[in-house]
Regions:
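Cytosolic catalytic domains that perform sulfur/thiol-centered chemistry
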Residues: 1-76, 80-198
């Protein structure tokens, strides 16, 4: 879903597991759908962790724990590894997450998140661990993600870190533009350049 991104302040969902791959994010059996049906993919985010094989709810999994919720997923190192399926980003966005925080993302998945209006924020290992500690100490603790300033702040500790983002992707997120929207927005500039170049 296209949404302009500025500053998000939210509680967080902690997932302190390393190397969460795209098959765990959205299992392969749900890839038959080739259009972005947000509710379908969101409902099946982390499907094999959220439910037991018999279809009953796994109450031990964090998404089923009423203590935790919000628009920010805080995940362990190497998030989104494995296959390049864009469906994984569709599932994350479809569930309602607008930010994923980790100390490292698989490159293709990171780009897929950006293309689907989810902001991947890379932080240091130390900052990530402090986030987990703060969330577990107080599930209502909030984190502020400021895209214009490119900062993330743990409001429990007051500590902030700067994060990097490609300037083009930042522009698109802040203005709610996908790649096609950007080309349309830039039409006059492109035509002017073509006229000068002839």
């Amino acid at each position: 879903m296209k949404q302009k991104f500025d500053i998000i302040t939210s509680t967080c969902v902690p997932l302190p597991l390393e190397s969460v791959d795209t098959d765990q994010i959205i299992p392969a059996r749900f890839l038959k759908a080739t259009t972005r049906e947000e509710k379908f993919f969101g409902d099946n985010l982390f499907r094999d962790w959220r439910y037991h094989p018999d279809g009953s709810l796994n109450n031990d999994f964090v998404l089923n724990n009423p203590l935790y919720g919000g628009e920010i997923l805080v995940a362990g190192k190497n998030f989104g590894s494995g296959s390049s399926r864009e469906h994984a980003a569709w599932a994350i966005a479809g569930y309602g997450f607008r930010v994923v925080v980790s100390s490292f993302f698989a490159d293709i998945h990171k780009n897929n998140e950006l293309n689907n209006f989810v902001l991947p924020v890379v932080v240091s290992e130390g900052f990530l661990q402090e986030l987990f500690d703060s969330i577990y100490a107080n599930p209502q603790m909030q984190v502020e993600v400021n895209l214009p300033e490119q900062t993330i702040t743990n409001q429990a500790t007051g500590k902030s870190e700067h994060f990097e983002i490609n300037a083009y992707k930042k522009h698109c997120l802040m203005n709610g533009l996908d790649d096609i929207d950007f080309l349309v927005e830039s039409k006059d500039k492109i035509e002017a350049w073509e006229n000068v170049s002839r």
